Regions:
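Sec-dependent bacterial lipoprotein signal peptides
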Residues: 1-17
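Predominantly soluble domains enriched in secretory-pathway, periplasmic, or organellar proteins
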Residues: 19-383
Length: 383
């Protein structure tokens, strides 16, 4: 058992000083006094990490935040028990979620629906006794926010704006727009970043391309062809590989990030709708709502490790609907708890989120959420 430790970098001190000049209860990156994050939380510069002293760090803990696309809400769950902590009203059509590196804050993109174009982000305080939206970030002219990631040293957000064809960089503490980078592609939907937050990529659905960004210099880099109707997107932690799912070709294209060229193509999917790569960079999950399956791959070799057929999993509810073309549960969003070696997957068709043991390669837990769950994010914050 490791003793509790605090790591506070020079960059964090600079960030704290900047925040103190414009004080706001929402701008502090630190957990509440009695809160803590577990060992293994992201220790990128600028983040205070308080290690939990629990002897068994492999046990599930922390919280999950699920965007309920059809419920205008986000469900906050205890990751250990899969019980609901709070159902938080957000904007119309919430699609994706990102959690700050210290685990305290969740940011939900309010995309809108068929009649309303959203342009806001909801910020949820996960450390509050009753998690709730503490502020709303207005993106102004940048409508249809979808993909979102904490980047830089954790002090910035990268958000796709589909209608504007921009990757919008937002200062998290102030909520002000830092810059908006051209995506050079239509339908820029998902965004994924390298673990150090210095480079990012977007999948541009309508053009079947991927665009890269240098977040240090705030410049748009290359745009290169990937696959038609590419939506699912994941980047290995070191930024070596970019995995791109094609909804129409039913394939996953693996790109060499340095060259922007394909190194492999995985086949046999109905719709590789969402892709996630573990923090270790060794395992990839591909969620396929058409074939109702969760696929697992070794990243280095691209070898298939497992295929979980949700129709055969006890505990998955009877289908309540789902998007057109979906069969059964409809697995969509994915996130990882790197300490417990567990992934969490939303089931759009059954209004559930499931825990998947990455060693046993099977579903080990279930939680009920709101209507039409889509994006999901894990926080190591221990309540």
């Amino acid at each position: 058992m490791r003793a509790p430790a605090i790591s506070l970098s020079v960059a964090a001190l600079a960030l704290a000083a900047a925040c103190s000049s414009n004080p706001s209860p929402q701008s502090s990156p630190n957990p509440r006094q009695d809160g803590r994050t577990r060992g293994g939380a992201d220790t990128m510069p600028g983040n205070r990490v308080i290690e939990n002293s629990r002897p068994d760090v492999s046990a599930r803990a922390g919280v999950l935040v699920v965007a309920n696309q059809e419920g205008a809400s986000a469900t906050v769950l205890d990751a250990a028990t899969m019980k609901t902590i709070a159902t938080v009203p957000v904007g119309v059509g919430p699609h994706e979620v990102a959690v700050s590196h210290d685990g305290r804050w969740a940011v939900v993109t309010n995309y809108g629906d068929r009649t309303t174009q959203g342009n806001t982000l909801s910020v949820i305080d996960l450390a509050a006794a009753a998690p709730a939206v503490t502020r709303t970030i207005d993106l102004g002219e940048y409508h249809r926010p979808h993909g979102v990631a904490f980047v830089g040293i954790g002090d910035k957000l990268a958000v796709t704006s589909e209608t504007s064809q921009r990757l919008v960089i937002v200062d998290f503490a102030s909520g002000r727009i830092d810059t908006a980078l051209a995506t050079n592609g239509r339908g820029s939907h998902m965004v994924a970043s390298r673990r150090d937050g210095r480079r990012a990529w977007t999948a541009n659905i309508s053009d079947g391309t991927v665009t890269e960004y240098d977040l240090d210099t705030r410049r748009t880099g290359r745009t290169y062809p990937a696959a038609p109707m590419d939506e699912g997107l994941a980047v290995s932690p070191g930024g070596v590989q970019v995995w791109v799912g094609s909804n129409s070709a039913h394939t996953v294209t693996v790109l060499d990030a340095a060259k922007g060229t394909p190194i492999d193509t995985l086949t046999g999917f109905g719709m590789p709708y969402r892709i996630g790569i573990s923090r270790s960079g060794t395992l990839a999950i591909v969620n396929d709502p058409v074939k109702n399956r969760i696929w697992m791959y070794e990243v280095g070799s691209r070898k298939q490790l497992a295929e979980i057929d949700l129709a055969k999993v006890d505990g998955v509810k009877a289908t309540t609907g789902g998007a057109p073309g979906e069969a059964g549960a409809g697995p969509e969003g994915v996130t990882f708890d790197p300490i417990a070696n567990v992934a969490y997957v939303t089931l759009h068709g059954t209004n559930q989120v499931v825990a998947v043991d990455l060693q046993q390669r099977k579903v080990i837990g279930f939680g009920s959420v709101g209507a039409g769950p889509d994006g999901v994010a894990f926080s190591p914050y221990v309540r």
